[in-house]
């Protein structure tokens, strides 16, 4: 039993020694990566997400709140993502808002939990200036580089409309650099009006992929799905590139093992190169001794003591390696020594260099998660049966059935040979029962000499019992051997019994030589023949050695560079335990002086059996050089060791040969085995359509709906004339709308063609005519002829344009405003000396472009307007109006003061000036304010903006709202000029005709809503009119005399009606009958009587039409189809056809 315990401990000792020596891991194969599956670093994927919010002026209040709500919803969805493998997500979130500046709140370094993150995002305030996406991307990249975790997944989610400030740098290069650093971008558009090309440029998405929009109700789910795929792909890639962690702390030192099995005796070493020492100095001549009688020849004596080693000679050339000798027989076991004291544990050694990283096999698939809890039952729905649902989850596999009972059937016939099956999958290695000990195999070939370092001296084992004394040897004396190297002093042998031989001649005394260098330990010589037993000598005193001093603690070595993980090598075969070698006998503690070499004595009598010596542990000797590798010993007897750990599954073997043999008899039914693994996923068929569910309870009433005022309905049919009422008493009411156009009169019959007259004689050339009349002179002439009222009085005017140049306007719309201001100034201010104009350009700051005293000509005014710079920041309307109030302090006394505000957004909340206070100051200074608001009715901020427009304007009739900047038409200019110069402009409208505008929204009938027109086209002549054309707009054209003519709409009458007006200052006169043409007058072509109809298509071309009210031809834009016949290709054709002479 004791031998089994010793063998078991000896087998465990190499396993412990290969892993740790005094707390230090030895070199060897590194642990498999699969063994570290539960390691923290390998089980977590780090994810850093930065939300980038557009806080510019174009995002306004509602869009900025929508962005914060989106971040709140998506951040919660991100934490609901679960990895598909045995991993965990470690997620950190940060938020960044940008405009012309960037604010990071919160950063990644201050991440605590999701609740704190949501609170800080909700507290963000709108910056409200220009859009600079470049700085947002650069700051997000710097944030992820500095505070993002190494080897983590980095994602930036950018929300913007992609319409940057003109001074914003290009984002292409910085976006590409960020993606090279491993940052993934996801872009979201704020509205349907986005720059899709720029958003794709930032995210790197292909052109065929649609752009994500913030208004999409499924946006959160779409981005959650996209992030889930991104995280799974990135984290799986990171796991494959995992690195070895830091080495752990050294473990506690192991217990000392039992002494190993006695090893075999090694082969005899080659004799060393003995060199003869130098001859010593001649000593003094001794006294001649007494010459004795010659004795008998004695027996061969024992070999003499080993002589002193001579001085070390030079190293000779390295000789060839000798042939491996045959191992000698095992020696007798030595006496068992006493158990020594346990030594102190040595200091931990330095860490060894890390090995190359290994590549582990794929881990086992994780278990399926638990099923979620059942939600609360919802209300019973009402509706038709829906489409068949998707296939349900796969069911759990059923248990294996009980084995059937029955008698074994007869042996079946041998079936036909089937085809060779495919190579099977790699099987799982299952440790089987330990097999029986096999027969002892033949001795294997000699292994390659091992390379190892000298180990420390082991603890001396217990002294074994003395072996039996061998029989005396017999043999003839051999030749005298060469003088060998001096060996260690052996024990003093017993005194021999024999005839004293003759005394030898004394040798010359040599000079003492230099002490030689301690020689190498010689190999053990062959066991000599037993000498004659001598007399027992005196028993010496037992020596006791002192323990040597404790060695100095070595310095801790520096940590080696991390090496690459190597491929694990194949597991080698288990070695056989060696045979325990004999323990040497301790020598005497005091060596005696060497006596003279005596003659060989005769054979002595066998001595008595000696007592066992006391084992005394001597001091630790110096470490000797490495000896030659011994031959492998014979396989020793022993008990089979403990089964080793389960090895890795080997590669699948080659496909076996097709078996040939008869079918065996059917075996008896085996014992019922455990239930098998789950089978493959089944393929089900779609079930039948379910029955219609029961009618559910009625739902709660919905919230009240919101809607805008509908468009004005069509005019109803004319009612029957009522009886004439009594004359009422009251004040005169407002002027009514234009009535409907009457029915077109019956076309007269064409008269017969008269006889052609005789051609007259060509007359003489008349004198040169007078200079033609100007536009103003023609208007004055018409007024004098028609007698329709006084001409417009040019009233002195102080006009200040307050122009919004904020970020939401945009550079293109700002150019439209510039053109609009120049055109409006031409209509209003015929003389800059009478009507003076000032300009204020504002955004987050206010620029006084021109004062009221600056301009002397319209060319200077237009040049200043063209040189205005687009600011593109916030909307500080209150500060701009305050600057207008300061400018009006330079106004002339008693002159009308008008401010025209053109804006597209509500005032910035950070404006230091209060809008209500500034407007009150303007009203107190008798400043009349008009407002042109450009905003769509479906805009979320329309109600707020509309209230602000009414607050700014002097009264509700001074507010004009348009959907966009393209709808600033001349009709608006007329309404403004009616307020400024009422008589003159109203006269122009009544003389040339004006379409009736239907207000679609608002507080007053003065508000105008016009849709976007067709692109404008320019006319080539000395006077150009550039404008669009559609059903709701007018076309101003030039007559041959240069008069600006307005085409008569289809609703206008064909006759010149008397001009009636209820306005003050306008006198009513009767038209001059001499200038009126008779309605019964016939034209050469019936097309001349048709009203002008531009048509309904979009292919506009220039044509000429005849206006019978002024008996003149003019140009107009013809749409290309469905127009009236009153159109001609040239002015000449129109004149020849229609104009009456």
Curated annotation (Swiss-Prot):
PROSITE patterns: BPTI_KUNITZ_1, BPTI_KUNITZ_2, VWFA. Its main location: secreted. Residues 48-227, 798-976 form the VWFA domain. Keywords: Basement membrane, Cell adhesion, Collagen, Disulfide bond, Extracellular matrix, Protease inhibitor, Repeat, Secreted, Serine protease inhibitor, Signal. Residues 345-356 have a biased composition (Pro residues). The keyword S-adenosyl-L-methionine does not apply. GO terms for molecular function: serine-type endopeptidase inhibitor activity. Residues 291-311, 735-753 have a biased composition (Basic and acidic residues). It is found in: Secreted, Extracellular space, Extracellular matrix, Basement membrane. Residues 1088-1138 form the BPTI/Kunitz inhibitor domain. It comes from the Eukaryota. Disulfide bonds join 1088-1138, 1097-1121, 1113-1134. GO terms for cellular component: basement membrane; collagen trimer; collagen-containing extracellular matrix; extracellular region. Expressed in skin, intestine, sternum, brain and kidney. Lower expression is also observed in heart, lung, sciatic nerve, dorsal root ganglia, peripheral nerves and calvaria of newborn mice and in intestine and brain of adult mice. Found in basement membrane surrounding a particular subset of Schwann cells in adult sciatic nerve. Residues 335-344 have a biased composition (Low complexity). Trimer or homomer. Secreted into as a 135 kDa monomer under reducing conditions and as a homotrimer under non-reducing conditions. Belongs to the VWA-containing collagen family. May act as a cell-binding protein. This is Collagen alpha-1(XXVIII) chain. It comes from Mus musculus.
């Amino acid at each position: 039993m004791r031998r089994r315990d010793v063998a078991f401990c000896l087998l465990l000792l190499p396993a412990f020694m290969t892993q740790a020596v005094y707390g230090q891991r030895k070199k060897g194969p590194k642990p498999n990566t699969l063994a570290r599956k539960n390691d923290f670093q390998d089980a977590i994927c780090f994810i850093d997400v930065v939300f980038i919010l557009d806080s510019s002026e174009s995002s306004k209040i509602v869009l900025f709140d929508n962005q914060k709500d989106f971040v709140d919803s998506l951040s919660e969805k991100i934490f609901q993502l679960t990895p598909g493998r045995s991993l965990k997500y470690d997620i950190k979130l940060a938020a960044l808002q940008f405009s012309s500046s960037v604010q990071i709140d919160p950063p990644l370094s201050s991440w605590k939990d999701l609740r704190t993150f949501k609170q800080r995002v909700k507290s963000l305030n709108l910056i409200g200036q220009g859009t600079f996406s470049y700085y947002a991307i650069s700051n997000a990249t710097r944030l992820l580089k500095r505070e993002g975790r190494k080897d983590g997944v980095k994602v930036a989610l950018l929300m913007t409309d992609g319409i940057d400030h003109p001074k914003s740098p290009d984002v292409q290069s910085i976006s590409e650099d960020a993606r090279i650093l491993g940052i993934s971008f996801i872009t979201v558009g704020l509205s349907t009006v986005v720059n899709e090309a720029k958003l794709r440029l930032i995210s790197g998405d292909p052109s065929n992929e649609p752009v994500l929009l913030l208004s999409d109700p499924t946006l959160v789910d779409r981005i959650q799905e996209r992030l889930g795929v991104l995280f799974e792909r990135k984290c799986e890639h990171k796991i494959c590139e995992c690195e070895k962690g830091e080495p752990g702390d050294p473990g506690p030192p192991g217990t000392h093992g039992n002494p190993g099995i006695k090893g075999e005796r090694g082969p005899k070493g080659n004799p060393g190169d003995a060199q003869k020492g130098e001859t010593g100095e001649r000593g003094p001549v001794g006294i001649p001794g007494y010459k004795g009688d010659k004795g008998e020849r004695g027996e061969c004596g024992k070999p003499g003591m080993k002589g002193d080693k001579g001085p070390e000679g030079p190293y000779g050339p390295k000789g060839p390696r000798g042939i491996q000798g045959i191992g000698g027989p095992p020696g007798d076991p030595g006496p068992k020594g006493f158990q020594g004291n346990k030594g102190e544990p040595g200091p931990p050694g330095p860490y060894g260099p890390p090995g190359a990283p290994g590549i582990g096999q794929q881990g086992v698939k994780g278990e399926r998660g638990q099923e979620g809890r059942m939600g609360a039952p919802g209300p019973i729905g009402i509706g038709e049966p829906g489409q068949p649902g998707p296939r349900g989850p796969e069911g759990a596999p059923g248990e294996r059935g009980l084995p059937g009972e029955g008698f074994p059937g007869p042996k079946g016939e041998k079936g036909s040979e089937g085809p060779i099956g495919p190579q099977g999958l790699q099987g799982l290695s299952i440790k089987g029962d330990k097999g029986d000990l096999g027969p002892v195999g033949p001795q294997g070939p000699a292994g390659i000499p091992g390379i190892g370092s000298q180990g420390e001296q082991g603890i001396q084992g217990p002294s074994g019992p003395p072996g039996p004394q061998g029989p005396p040897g017999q043999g003839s004396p051999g030749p005298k051997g060469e003088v060998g190297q001096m060996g260690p002093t052996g024990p003093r042998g017993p005194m021999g019994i024999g005839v004293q031989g003759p005394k030898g001649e004394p040798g010359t005394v040599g000079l003492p030589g230099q002490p030689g260098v301690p020689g190498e330990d010689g190999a053990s010589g062959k066991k000599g023949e037993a000498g004659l037993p001598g007399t027992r000598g005196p028993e010496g005193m037992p020596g006791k050695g002192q323990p040597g001093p404790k060695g100095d603690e070595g310095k801790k070595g520096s940590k080696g560079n991390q090496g690459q993980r190597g491929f694990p090598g194949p597991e080698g075969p288990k070695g056989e335990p060696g045979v325990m070698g004999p323990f040497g006998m301790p020598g005497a503690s005091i060596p005696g002086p060497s006596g003279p070499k005596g003659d060989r004595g005769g054979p002595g009598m066998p001595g008595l059996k000696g007592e066992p010596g006391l084992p005394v542990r001597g001091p630790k000797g110096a470490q000797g050089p490495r000896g030659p590798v011994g031959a492998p010993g014979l396989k020793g007897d022993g008990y089979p060791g403990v089964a080793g750990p389960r090895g890795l599954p080997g590669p699948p073997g080659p496909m076996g040969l097709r078996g040939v043999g008869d079918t065996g008899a059917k075996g008896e039914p085996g014992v019922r085995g455990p239930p098998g693994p789950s089978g493959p996923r089944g393929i089900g068929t779609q079930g039948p359509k379910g029955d219609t569910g029961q009618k559910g309870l009625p739902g709660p009433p919905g919230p009240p709906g919101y809607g805008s005022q509908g468009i004005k309905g069509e005019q109803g049919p004319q009612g029957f004339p009522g009886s004439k009422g009594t004359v009422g008493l009251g004040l005169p009411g407002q002027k009514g709308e234009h009535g409907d156009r009457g029915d077109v009169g019956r076309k007269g019959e064409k008269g017969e063609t008269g006889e052609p007259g005789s051609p007259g004689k060509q007359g003489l050339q008349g004198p040169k005519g007078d200079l033609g009349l100007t536009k103003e002179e023609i208007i004055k002439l018409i007024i004098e002829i028609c007698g329709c009222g006084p001409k417009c009085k040019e009233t002195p005017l102080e006009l200040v344009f307050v122009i919004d140049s904020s970020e939401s306007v945009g550079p293109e719309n700002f150019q439209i405003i510039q053109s609009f201001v120049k055109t409006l100034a031409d209509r209003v201010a015929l003389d800059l000396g009478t009507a003076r104009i000032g300009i204020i350009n504002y955004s987050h700051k206010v620029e006084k472009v021109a004062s009221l005293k600056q301009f002397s000509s319209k060319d200077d005014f237009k040049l200043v307007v063209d040189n205005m710079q687009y600011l593109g920041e916030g909307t500080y309307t209150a500060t701009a109006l305050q600057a207008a109030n300061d400018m009006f302090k330079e106004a002339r006394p008693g002159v009308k003061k008008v401010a025209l505000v053109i804006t597209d957004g509500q005032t910035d909340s950070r404006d230091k000036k209060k809008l209500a206070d500034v407007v009150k100051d303007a009203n107190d200074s008798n400043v009349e304010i008009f407002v042109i608001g450009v905003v769509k009715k479906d805009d979320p901020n329309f109600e707020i903006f509309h209230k602000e427009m009414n607050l700014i304007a002097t009264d509700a009739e001074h507010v004009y709202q348009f959907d966009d900047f393209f709808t600033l038409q001349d009709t608006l200019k007329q309404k403004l000029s009616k307020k400024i110069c009422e008589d003159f402009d109203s006269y122009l409208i009544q003389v040339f005709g004006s379409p009736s505008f239907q207000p679609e929204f608002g507080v007053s009938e003065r508000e105008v809503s016009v849709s976007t027109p067709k692109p404008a086209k320019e006319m080539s002549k000395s006077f150009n009119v550039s404008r669009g054309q559609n059903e709701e707009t007018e076309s101003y054209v030039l007559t041959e005399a240069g008069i600006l003519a307005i085409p008569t709409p289809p609703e206008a009458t064909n006759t010149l009606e008397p001009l009636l007006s209820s306005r003050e200052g306008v006198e009513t006169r009767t038209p001059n009958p001499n200038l009126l043409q008779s309605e019964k007058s016939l034209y050469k072509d019936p097309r001349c009587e048709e009203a002008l109809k531009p048509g309904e298509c979009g292919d506009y071309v220039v044509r000429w039409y005849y206006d019978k009210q002024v008996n003149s031809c003019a140009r107009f834009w013809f749409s290309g189809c469905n127009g009236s016949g009153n159109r001609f290709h040239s002015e000449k054709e129109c004149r020849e056809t229609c104009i009456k002479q």
